[in-house]
A protein has these predicted regions:
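Alpha-helical transmembrane segments of multi-pass inner-membrane proteins
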Residues: 3, 7-19, 29-42, 61, ...
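Aromatic-rich transmembrane-lumenal/periplasmic boundary elements in polytopic membrane proteins
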Residues: 72-92, 160-172, 182, 301-334, ...
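Short extracytoplasmic/periplasmic juxtamembrane "stem" segments immediately C-terminal to an N-terminal membrane anchor
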Residues: 90-95, 177-178, 311-325, 499-521
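Juxtamembrane membrane-water interface segments that cap and precede transmembrane helices
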Residues: 18, 94-110, 172-184, 319-323, ...
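TM-adjacent membrane-interface loops and short helices in multi-pass inner/ER membrane proteins
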Residues: 71, 130, 187, 322-361, ...
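Soluble catalytic regions of membrane-associated enzymes that act on cell-envelope
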Residues: 352, 357-359, 490-680, 697, ...
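Hydrophobic alpha-helical transmembrane segments in integral membrane proteins
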Residues: 299-315, 466-512
């Protein structure tokens, strides 16, 4: 049974990173089931009165898992109001108008929080199993070599993929859009996080297996080195370490590169603390040098360019992470004690978002900030307790050990833990399913390296646990097995059912048979995954189409009960209430939808349309103006202008509502031109010059559009003045200089035109238009 448990242990350790980082729901389910079955088989191997070993930090880790479950289960509303007033307010404002409630959870998305509880329960069992299994010295040595080999193979694949790739993982999986995949990972930062944990361990093994050939001639030393198995393994581990470090640099993960460098400094420092390790310190430094030389062979230009993107034209360090972290401060302030529920960042963040753009933000890109905002102070303290307990138990034992293998392996594993902790300052590695598993493997490895005895009859310095601990472990494992089987099995089944009808358009023209099939499928999906709000929301939309108002309301209530901060559901509820002539309720839910997704222009446009229909033009104007500021794309601005025109607002009024930027004026002009108002379009374009000082997103073509209007009217003086203003903002821009030369030529000032053409050729020597212009002017000069 113990061998079966060990095989499962190795399987999940290898499978998770190779399965695209175990990001797919099926891969996560396999990970969780493997962890629990591995624990079951190990417990079955403990016959009679035999008990497992005590595991450092298991109590705080178990309490952390319990805290996640506690966040997800319904509690008396009065208790929630007392410990988390902000959570109570959300449920009161978003769910209260539809139904009275007396029990609510601390989490604003209990389904996500419970899923995180299951994930960390699997990690807990895996950590426990790692400590138990690696107390066997043979399994310990075998496991670390298997992991080193896995990381080496992944590094080779990542490097080859970087050089010869079709843009897909394994040649067939494209991964999600807007992500840069490296190796088998869909996100390059997660790949570098994985390698950052494993590389120090591999270097530790590399140092341990260094052949001890200190006497004899150089020839004898070389022969002894190549004839021994240790010498071969030493070279293989060193080669793997160089490949792994090189692949981190080639991944272009800035956080990964920085954390790798910091971890190497720490590893050298740790070896410096022990006497007689100066040679090992030199070997680590040599490995780092070889990594840098290897990167030089591939070229530093992409890496330098990647780091250069972190600075703007003025040399200031800019990154959207800073904005997200600043926004998260508001979340921490509102949910300081209990958090919003671990795993709910993506759901709650839109209500605090000030980040420009419409790109979805799923995580804080800082695991510590996300833990504090979603897990609260209670969750943070439990995590700190676990880390302190782990460090105290392992460091104290490491200091007592005299075995070089224990020293090298412990320092390598401990440095790997530090590497992921460094990286987590700027990324969300603990929300990578595979990296979370590997982190707890490294924790278990640190315990095993410091406690497992490599000689003698006694396996480990770990103490045996009591029979009570064994029974508690059995109960936890069996309960988790049942719950995760039901939860993951139901989630996978519900997802498969939903995929059958996802994208199906249900309307009044849909046949009864088709609509009945859709409703039945969604009912089953909601049955198999009762904590997923997407299925009740879909049912509410279907019933609303067929005028089943009470059924639609019931399913909307259920969706809000499961996630009261979903702005899509809140907005649909507002529309539902408005159609039933409940204007006060409709307005309330429109306001809640905007409040929980303030940076989404679509929420504001929908609310503004409702306000315009109700005759509340002033408030609608404010929302539309904000919507245009949030998204300055042509489609969005045109949609806002069209909405105002549809509701009968005058063109002058609409122009006055535009944001104080240039581009919205151009879109307004294009819209007016399409409706045949050419003079109004001309005026809008020319008046855009009044907003130069207000616009921080000026582009050269903004000036050129105004310039063309004057050139069409043959007003060369005004056209020239526009180009001169453009040169103040974009000095040396070849296109602006070229147009300036053309304008001077039309004005009959050839020598000034020649000067401008010459300036163009200084910046762009191959510019054909400037060269041709100078040739034409040669007869005049």
């Amino acid at each position: 049974m113990r061998n079966v448990s060990y095989r499962i242990f190795l399987f999940v350790l290898i499978f998770s990173p190779l399965a695209f980082g175990a990001r797919d729901p099926l891969a996560l389910a396999i990970l969780e089931w493997s962890c629990v079955f591995g624990a079951v088989f190990y417990l079955l191997a403990l016959k009679g009165n035999a008990t497992p070993y005590r595991v450092p930090g298991l109590l705080p880790l178990g309490l952390f898992v319990g805290w996640l479950v506690f966040q997800a289960v319904p509690l008396p509303a009065t208790l929630v109001k007392w410990v988390s007033p902000a959570t109570y307010l959300i449920y009161r404002e978003n769910l209260g108008p539809l139904e009275e409630f007396s029990w609510i959870p601390l989490s604003v998305y209990p389904g996500k929080t419970l899923a995180e509880g299951f994930r960390f329960s699997a990690y807990l069992l895996f950590y426990w199993g790692t400590v138990q299994l690696l107390s066997d010295r043979d399994k310990l040595k075998k496991t670390v070599l298997v992991v080193a080999g896995l990381a080496g193979v992944m590094a080779v694949y990542a490097i080859v993929e970087t050089l010869f790739t079709n843009g897909k993982i394994y040649g067939f999986y494209a991964g999600p859009a807007n992500n840069t995949h490296v190796g088998p990972y869909v996100y390059h930062n997660h790949y570098s996080g994985f390698m950052g944990m494993i590389l120090p361990m591999v270097l530790g093994l590399y140092l341990y297996y260094r052949p001890q050939a200190r006497y004899g001639s150089w020839r004898e030393r070389v022969v002894e080195f190549w004839s021994g198995a240790a010498g071969h393994l030493h070279l293989l581990l060193g080669f793997a370490a160089v490949l792994m470090g090189t692949s981190v640099f080639l991944s272009l993960s800035r956080g990964g590169v920085i954390s790798l460098c910091l971890s190497m400094i720490c590893l050298v420092g740790f070896f410096s603390l022990r006497k007689g390790t100066s040679r090992r310190k030199r070997f680590v430094s040599l490995s780092v040098l070889l990594i840098l030389l290897s990167v030089s062979w591939f070229g530093w230009e992409p890496i330098v360019e990647r780091f250069g993107r972190a600075f703007n034209e003025e040399g200031k360090f800019v990154n959207s992470r800073f904005t997200i972290w600043n926004d998260a401060y508001g979340m921490v302030n509102d949910f300081f004690l209990t958090g919003t529920g671990v795993g709910t960042f993506e759901a709650i963040y839109p209500g605090y978002r000030s980040l420009q753009g419409q790109k979805s933000v799923g995580h804080a890109h800082n695991d510590y900030i996300e833990l504090l905002s979603c897990g609260g102070v209670i969750g943070c303290l439990l995590v700190v307790w676990f880390v302190v307990a782990l460090f105290r138990a392992t460091w104290a034992m490491y200091r007592k050990r005299r075995d070089p293998y224990a020293h090298c392996l412990y320092l390598g594993s401990f440095t790997g833990i530090l590497a992921i902790c460094f990286h987590s300052v700027v990324d969300f590695n603990f929300y990578s399913n595979a990296n979370g598993l590997v982190f707890f493997f490294m924790c278990g490895l640190a315990v095993a390296a410091s406690h497992t005895r490599l000689r003698g009859r006694q396996e480990t310095f770990l103490a045996d646990s009591t029979p009570v601990h064994k029974r508690v472990t059995w109960v936890f494992t069996v309960v988790f097995l049942l719950l995760v089987g039901v939860y993951q099995g139901g989630s996978l089944r519900a997802s498969a059912l939903f995929d059958r009808v996802d994208g199906t358009v249900v309307s009044g023209d849909t046949t009864l048979q088709e609509s009945s099939q859709v409703i039945e499928t969604l009912h089953w999906a909601a049955f198999f995954a009762p904590l997923e709000p997407a299925y009740p929301f879909a049912l509410a939309q279907v019933f609303a189409v067929y005028g089943e108002g009470d059924m639609a309301k019931g399913w909307l209530t259920q969706a809000l009960r499961l996630c009261p901060v979903d702005s899509s559901v809140l907005q649909y509820t507002a529309r539902y209430a408005s159609r039933r002539n409940r204007k006060v309720l409709g307005r309330h839910y429109f306001e809640r939808a905007v409040a929980h997704d303030a940076a989404n222009p679509d929420r504001r446009k929908m609310f503004a349309g409702w306000l315009l229909g109700a005759g509340e033009t002033d408030e609608a104007s404010l929302h539309l103006k904000q919507a245009m500021l949030l998204d300055v794309s042509k489609d969005n601005i045109k949609a806002c202008i069209s909405l105002l025109l549809y509701h009968g607002l005058s063109k002058e009024t609409i122009y006055g509502m535009l944001p104080e930027r240039i581009y919205p004026r151009f879109v307004f002009a294009d819209t007016m031109s399409a409706f045949g108002h050419g003079e109004l379009a001309r005026e809008a374009i020319l008046r855009a010059m009044d907003y130069l000082e207000c616009d921080d997103s000026l582009r050269p073509w903004h000036f050129m559009k105004i310039y063309r209007v004057y050139m069409t009217e043959k007003d060369y003086d005004m056209a020239l003045s526009v180009l001169q203003r453009a040169s103040e903002y974009f000095p040396g821009h070849p296109k602006i200089r070229l147009l300036t030369g053309d304008t001077y030529l039309k004005m009959g000032i050839p020598y000034r035109a020649a000067e401008e053409y010459e300036q163009v050729l200084i910046v762009d020597p191959d510019n054909r238009r400037a060269t041709a212009g100078l040739k034409r002017l040669s007869s005049y000069l």
